[in-house]
UniProtKB/Swiss-Prot annotation:
Positions of modified residues (Phosphoserine): 1092, 1096, 1162, 1237, 1243, 1261, 1288, 1292, 1303, 1306, 1474, 1495, 1514, 1542, 1554, 1574, 1600, 1603, 1714, 1726, 1739
N6,N6,N6-trimethyllysine: modified positions: K130
Protein name stated in the entry: Myosin-1
Tagged with keyword Phosphoprotein: yes
Coiled coil segments of this chain: 843-1939
Species this chain originates from: Homo sapiens (Human)
Amino acid sequence: MSSDSEMAIFGEAAPFLRKSERERIEAQNKPFDAKTSVFVVDPKESFVKATVQSREGGKVTAKTEAGATVTVKDDQVFPMNPPKYDKIEDMAMMTHLHEPAVLYNLKERYAAWMIYTYSGLFCVTVNPYKWLPVYNAEVVTAYRGKKRQEAPPHIFSISDNAYQFMLTDRENQSILITGESGAGKTVNTKRVIQYFATIAVTGEKKKEEVTSGKMQGTLEDQIISANPLLEAFGNAKTVRNDNSSRFGKFIRIHFGTTGKLASADIETYLLEKSRVTFQLKAERSYHIFYQIMSNKKPDLIEMLLITTNPYDYAFVSQGEITVPSIDDQEELMATDSAIEILGFTSDERVSIYKLTGAVMHYGNMKFKQKQREEQAEPDGTEVADKAAYLQNLNSADLLKALCYPRVKVGNEYVTKGQTVQQVYNAVGALAKAVYDKMFLWMVTRINQQLDTKQPRQYFIGVLDIAGFEIFDFNSLEQLCINFTNEKLQQFFNHHMFVLEQEEYKKEGIEWTFIDFGMDLAACIELIEKPMGIFSILEEECMFPKATDTSFKNKLYEQHLGKSNNFQKPKPAKGKPEAHFSLIHYAGTVDYNIAGWLDKNKDPLNETVVGLYQKSAMKTLALLFVGATGAEAEAGGGKKGGKKKGSSFQTVSALFRENLNKLMTNLRSTHPHFVRCIIPNETKTPGAMEHELVLHQLRCNGVLEGIRICRKGFPSRILYADFKQRYKVLNASAIPEGQFIDSKKASEKLLGSIDIDHTQYKFGHTKVFFKAGLLGLLEEMRDEKLAQLITRTQAMCRGFLARVEYQKMVERRESIFCIQYNVRAFMNVKHWPWMKLYFKIKPLLKSAETEKEMANMKEEFEKTKEELAKTEAKRKELEEKMVTLMQEKNDLQLQVQAEADSLADAEERCDQLIKTKIQLEAKIKEVTERAEDEEEINAELTAKKRKLEDECSELKKDIDDLELTLAKVEKEKHATENKVKNLTEEMAGLDETIAKLTKEKKALQEAHQQTLDDLQAEEDKVNTLTKAKIKLEQQVDDLEGSLEQEKKIRMDLERAKRKLEGDLKLAQESTMDIENDKQQLDEKLKKKEFEMSGLQSKIEDEQALGMQLQKKIKELQARIEELEEEIEAERASRAKAEKQRSDLSRELEEISERLEEAGGATSAQIEMNKKREAEFQKMRRDLEEATLQHEATAATLRKKHADSVAELGEQIDNLQRVKQKLEKEKSEMKMEIDDLASNMETVSKAKGNLEKMCRALEDQLSEIKTKEEEQQRLINDLTAQRARLQTESGEYSRQLDEKDTLVSQLSRGKQAFTQQIEELKRQLEEEIKAKSALAHALQSSRHDCDLLREQYEEEQEAKAELQRAMSKANSEVAQWRTKYETDAIQRTEELEEAKKKLAQRLQDAEEHVEAVNAKCASLEKTKQRLQNEVEDLMIDVERTNAACAALDKKQRNFDKILAEWKQKCEETHAELEASQKESRSLSTELFKIKNAYEESLDQLETLKRENKNLQQEISDLTEQIAEGGKRIHELEKIKKQVEQEKSELQAALEEAEASLEHEEGKILRIQLELNQVKSEVDRKIAEKDEEIDQMKRNHIRIVESMQSTLDAEIRSRNDAIRLKKKMEGDLNEMEIQLNHANRMAAEALRNYRNTQAILKDTQLHLDDALRSQEDLKEQLAMVERRANLLQAEIEELRATLEQTERSRKIAEQELLDASERVQLLHTQNTSLINTKKKLETDISQIQGEMEDIIQEARNAEEKAKKAITDAAMMAEELKKEQDTSAHLERMKKNLEQTVKDLQHRLDEAEQLALKGGKKQIQKLEARVRELEGEVESEQKRNVEAVKGLRKHERKVKELTYQTEEDRKNILRLQDLVDKLQAKVKSYKRQAEEAEEQSNVNLSKFRRIQHELEEAEERADIAESQVNKLRVKSREVHTKIISEE
C-alpha cells in the first residue's frame, strides 16, 4: 500500500482510486471477532452482515446489523474477513472467498466511488452513472510504466500492462471489455484508446492534405476522433443504456518497433439496421438524427430541407426523442469536428449529411391504393421530391421504381405491381440499406485515413461488443448479440480455466485438474451447429414459400424437449408475444421470430438500387457499386467473399463468418479481461442491487477466476530470463567461471533467498510463481541494486579522496624541502667562502657551456640525419595509410551492404512468418468452413433420402385413392336414389346432428387440453429426471465438502483458542498503553513549559547581539587608536636601535684601538679607564633607555594583545551574527523586492482600471452625443418622408410618361430590395444570437452554482478529514506509548513504532513539497490573474471601440440613405423607383430605429456589467495583495522546512524500505507468529552488533584523543629537556612564550564560546588569564635582555629551526585535539539551538498554517468569482464575434451592391449626360467609402478572432486554476497532519541531542582538565628557565667584572 504522499501524483483522482492512510489505520484498529462476525442469507438483500449469538444442532442464531434476529442453517452462514481486507483492491487476497465477501467488497468500494477492482487476473468495473475525475492527463501520467501492484486498480493499469507485455514479450495483445448492456463498456473502450494515444504518441502531423487544403491532425488525434463519429452513427438510447453501442467493433492499434503509434484499423460487426425504421417506446434511434435536428448548425437544417422537430419524421419519433445525459448540440459539434479531423472531403461530408436527411424523409413518404385496384400510388410528391433532391435522383423515377419495380423473369424484365404495404416495406428496406452501407463506407474511409503506411510490428486490439441484452421484445439482432457474448464468455472460460491448467500439466507441475462447471458449449452448439437455429433459419430462407410459422415449427420439431437450453416460453400479460426461449449464461431470453426470414434475406428493390448506382452523388453511387437485391456485405467496411452461392449471402451467415474471424484474432493474442458490472437497473449513482450484481458475478466467472488465481501460478518466467534478472539477489549462489544449467541455477538462487518456498514451482522450461511473489522479488531486486550502487559510489569517492590526500602529502613535503633549502641559503649567503663560490661558479659554467655547445652541435647533426630518415619513413607510411584507408572504406561499404541485405532478409523473414501465420489462420477458417459445408451436405442428403421415401409413399397413396374413387363413382348412383328417400329423414335428424356437433366440439377441446397437459407432464418428467441426476451428484459433492468443512472447523476451533489467548495479551498491553499515555501527557506539558523558557532566552540572546554590535564599533575605533600608538612606538624603538648600533660600533673601534695600543702608558690606561667608565655610564643609560622603551612596548603589546584577543573573539562571534543577519537581510530584501513587484503590479492594475473608467466615461458621453445626433437624423428623415409623400401625388401624374425609364431602372430597385432584405435577415440573426448568448449566460450561471455546491461539499469533506486526522493523531500517540513501554518485552513492536514515526517524517517531507508546490501555484495564479485582468480590460476597450465603429457605420448608412433621396429629387427619370424606394426606406428606418433602441438597452446592460466588473477587479486586486503577503509567509516556512528536510532525508531513506516490510508483517502477524519471533531475534542481534560497533567506534575515538594527549605530554617533556639543554638560548624561550601567548588566546576563545553552557570553567579561565599576564611580564624581561645576547641568538638559530619543526608537529597535534573538543562543543550547542528553534518554528507554523488554510479558502471563493466573471466576458466576446461575422456578411453584400451600382452606372451613362456624370462621381465616392469600410471591417474581424482565442484560453486557465486551488487545500490539510507528527519526532531528537551533549560535555571537561595540567607543567618549565636566566646573568656579570 502506498502512502498518501505517493498517491499525490494522481491529483484529485486519488480518493477515487485508493483508501487513505487514515482509513487503512482505522480498518486495522477496528474491533473484530472472527468467530461471531458473519454474513447470513437474507431473502431481500441476498446477504447481510450479522453477529452470531448461538449455534445449536446445525442451526445458527444471528443478529443482523438492522437489529433483527434470524435463525439459519450452517451452510447459509459465511465467515466475514478481518477489517483490514475492507475495500481490498485485489479480491484474490481475501482470507475467506465466497459470494457475500466479493459482493460486499464491491459494494463498499462502489460506495466510496472506487469503481475498479482486481479479481485475480482480470479487472472488474462497476458503472458509476456519474462523472468521476479519474481519467485526466495527470492520472494517465501516473499510471505510465507502473507495475500492476504499484498502482491502484484502473483501466489505465490494464492498458499499460498490455502495452508493456507487448514490448517485452513481443506478442500481440487484446483487451476484452465485456458485460451486459449499460455496464460501461463503451466508456472504458474510449479510455483505453485515450491512454494509448497519450503514452505512445508520435507527435508528427500527417503529410497528406485534403482537397480543402487543411492539414490533418496527428494519428493519435484521428484515433480518438474516430470514436465520436462512430458513436453518432452507431450508438443509440436503449432501455438500459443511454449510449448503447448498436454495433460491435474491434479496434486494432498498431505499434512500431520502438513502441510508438504506427497505425490503426477498425472492424465492425452487425450494425442494428432495424433501429433506423423502428424503436421501442423507451428507446430512440441513432444519435445523429437528433444531433442534426438540435439546430446547432442551422445551415444543415436548410441544406437537408428538414425541421427541428423530431415528431415531424416517423422513422425517428417512435420512442423518446431526448436523453437527459446527452447534449445533442455539443455532440453535433464533436461529430462535425471528427469528420474534419479524419480527413473526409467537403463533398463527402455533405454527402453523409444528405444521405442521413434522405433516410428521415423516406419515413414520411405516403402511398395510397388506387381505386378498384390493389396497386399502390403516391399520396403526394413533396416528400419524395426532397428525398430525391438530397440523393441527386429524379423524383418521378424514384416513385415509379417504388410503385412499379421491374423484375427479371428469365431473360426479360417485367414491370410488377406493388401493394401499399409492399411499397412501405421496400422504402424501409432502402432506408436501412442506405444507412448501413453509409456506415460501413465511413468505417472503410476511417481505416484508409488511419493507415499511415509506417512500419508496424505488433498490435493491441480493443474489443467493444454490444452487451448481453434481455428486452421485452427480442428479435434476430438480440440473438446475434447474445450469441457473440456467449462465445466471448466461452473464450474467457477456456483461457482462464482450461488453458491455464493444461499449461501446468505440460510443464510437469503437480496439479489436480479442477472443473469449474463453466462450459457453455451446449448453448453455442444449439445456435451455430448443423440443424441449429442459424442453420434452420438459413434453410428456410432458401425456400420461397417459407413463413415465420414454418420456421417456428421446424425449431420446435428439432429442439423442443431435446435440448435443455431451448424452451417454450410461458405467455405473460402485457408483454409482446414470444415464440421460443434460450437459456444463456446470463439468463433466459424470450425471442420473437416475426420477420426473421426477411431480415436474414435483407431484400432490396433492384430498380431503386439501379437508380442509386446512376446517381450524380458519387458517394451514393459508390455505396451501391455491384449491388443486387440481396447484398454480400462484410463487417468493418471490408467486403468478404460470398459463401452461399453467387446470388446472395444471408445476414446470419455473414455474421457467423465475421464472428469466427474475430475469435481467430483473439486466439492469436494474449488477452486481458475487463468485466463490466451494472449496479442497478434505474441508473442511480451509488446504488447497488445485490441480486443483480450476484447474477452477473456468477455468469462472468468472477469467483472461479479468483480461485484459479489463488490456487494456481499466474506468474511465470523462463529459467534463463529468471537467472539473468534475479541473479543479483544472491550472486554467490551461482558459482562464477563454471557452466551451470539455467534451471539448476534458478533452483539454487530461489533456495538461497528468504521467501516462502511453497509459493513457487519448477516446470520443464519455466519457473511458476503464485500471485504476488514476483512483485516481492522485484522489490528485493530494487533494494539490492540500491545497496550495490551506494556501495560502489562510496568506494569511488573514497578512492578519489585518497588520491587527493596523497597529492596534498606530496605537496607538503615539497614545500618543507623548499623552505629548508631557502633557510640554509639565507644562513650562508654572507659567508666569504660562499661569496667566493658565487663569483667562481659562473666561470665554471661558461667552460661547461662551451663543452655543452660542442656536444649539442654533434647531437644536432645526428638528429638532422635521423630526421631525414624519419621523413622518408613517414612518407612511406602515409602512402601505406592511404591505401589502407581505401581498403577500409571498401570493407565498410561491403559490411554496410551485407548489413542492409541482412536487415532486408530479416524483414522478409518477419513478413514471411506473418504471412505464414495469416495463411495458417485462413487454412483453419477454410477447414472449419469445409467441415461445416460437409456437415450441411450430409444433412441435406439425409433429408433428400427422407423426402424420396415420402414421395414413394405418397404415390402409393395416390393409386389407392384412384381405386377408391372408382368405387365411389359406382356407389354414387346407388346413393342418389337413397338420398331422395333419406331427405325426409334428414330433416328429422338435423336437430340431433346439431346437438352432436356441439358435443363433438366440446370433446375435441377436452381432448386437445389433455394432449397439452400430457405433453407438459412429459416435459416435467424429463426435467425432473435430469434434476434428480444433478441433485444426486450435488449430494455426493456436498458429502465430500461436508467432510472437508468438518476438518476446517476443527482447525478453526484450534485457531480460535489461540486467538483468544492473543486477545487477552492485547487487552493487557492496551491497559499499559493508557497508563503510559498519561505519563507522556505530563512530560509534554513540561516540555511546553521548557519551550516557553527557551523562547525567552532566545529573545535575550538577540538583545545581547544588538549590544555586541555596538561594542564592536567602539572596539574598532579603539583598535585604530592603538595601532597609531604602536606605529609611534615602533618609530622610537627604531631610533633607539640605531643609537645602540652606533654605540656598539664606536665600542668596537675603541676596543680595537686599545688592542693596538697594548703597551701604552699609564696615562693612556687612566684615559682608557675614564673612557671605559664613561662608556659604562653611557651603556647603562642606553640600557635604561632601552628598558624603558621595552617596558612601554611590552605594556602596549600586552594591551594590544589583550584587545586583539578580546576583539578577535568578539569579531568571530559578531561575524557569525553578521552572517546570520546578512542572510536574514538578503531574505528580507527578497521579500521586499517581491512586495515591491506586487505593489507595482497592483498600482499598474489600478492605473489601468482608472484609465478604463475614464475611457468608459468618455465613451458614454460620446454615445449620448451620438444618440442625440441619431434623434435629429430621425426627425429629419420623418420630415423628408412627409415631404416625399406630398410630392408623390405630383409624381404620379408623370408616371405614364416615364414608363420606359421605369423598366430600365427596375433592376436597380430589385438590387436595393435584396439589400434591404439581407439587412432584415441579419437583424433577425443578431436577435437570435442575442437570445442564444442569454441562454449561454444562464447555463454558465447554473454551472457556477453547481461549482459552488461542489465546493461546499469539498469543505464538508475537508472538515471530516480534519476530525479523522485528530483521531488518527490520538491513535498514533497511543501506539507510540505502547511501543515505548513494551520496548524490552516486545522488540518487534518497538521497531514498528520507530518505523511508523520514520514514515511520518517522510510524510512531513512530502507535505513540505506539497506546500512548496502550492506556493508556486499560488504565485502563478496571482500572476496569471493579473495578466488576465489586464487583457480583459484591453478587450473591453476593444469592444467599446468596435461599438463606436458600428455607430459610425450606422451614420454612414444614414448618409447613404440621404444621398439616394437627393438622387431621387434630382432625377425625374427615376420617379417610380424613387417613390417605392422611399417607402421601403421609411419602413427600414423604423426597423433601424427599433434596433437602435435595442442597442441602447444593450449599452445600458454593458454599463452595468462594466461597473460590476470594476468592483470585482478592485476586489481581486485586494485579494492579490493579501495573497502576496501570504505567499511571502509561505516562502519563509518553505525555507525553514527545507533546512529540516536535508537533515531528515537520510533517515527517511533508511526507514522507507523497512517500514513497508514491517507493515506487511503486521498484516500476517496471526499466521506467521513464529517466523516473526525468529526475525525479531535476528534483528535484536543485528542491533546488538550495531551497538557494539558504536561502542568500538567511541572507544577508538577516545583512544585516538588519548594518544594525541599523550603525544602532547611527550612533546611538553621534550620541550622541557630542550630548555634544560639550551640554558643560554633566550631566543628559544621567547618563541615558546609567544606560542604560549597564542595558546592562551586560543584557550580564551574556546572558553568564551562555551561560556553560556560551561559556567563552572570560569575559575579555570581566570587562572589562565593570570598566568598569561605573568608570562607577558616574563616576556618583557626577556626582551630587555635580548639585545645583550643578539650575537648568541645568531649562532643558535640553526639549532632552533630543527627544534622548531618538532615543536610545530606537537603544536599541530594539540591544536587538532582542541579543535576536536571545540567541534564537539559546537555540535552540542548547535543541536540545542536547533531544538529550540524547531520547537518555536513548529508552534509558529501551526498557527500560520491555519491562517493559510483560511486564506486559501477565501482565495478559492474569489477565484470562482473571477471564473464566472471571465465566463461573462467570454460571452460578451462571443457576441462581438457574432457581430463581426455579421459585419463580414454585410461587407459581402456591400461588395455585391457595388457591382450592381457599377452595372447601373453603365446603363445610366446611355440615358443621361449631365445627371449621369454627377451620379458617376457620387457612385465612385461611394465605392471608395465602401472599400475603406471593407478594410476596416476585415481588421476588426481579425482583432475580434484574436480576442476570442485569448478569452477562450483564459477561461480554460481559470478552470484549471480552480482545480489546482482545490488540490492545494487538500495538500495543506495533509501538511498540518504531518507537521504534528514532525513535532513529536523533533522532541525525540531533542532528547537524543541532550544525551549526546551530556556525553560531549563530560569529554570536554576531561580534556579541559588535561589541558590545564599541561599548562601547569609548562609554567614549571618556565620558572626553571627564569632561574637559569638569573644564573646566566650572574655568570655574565662575573665574567665582565673579571675582565
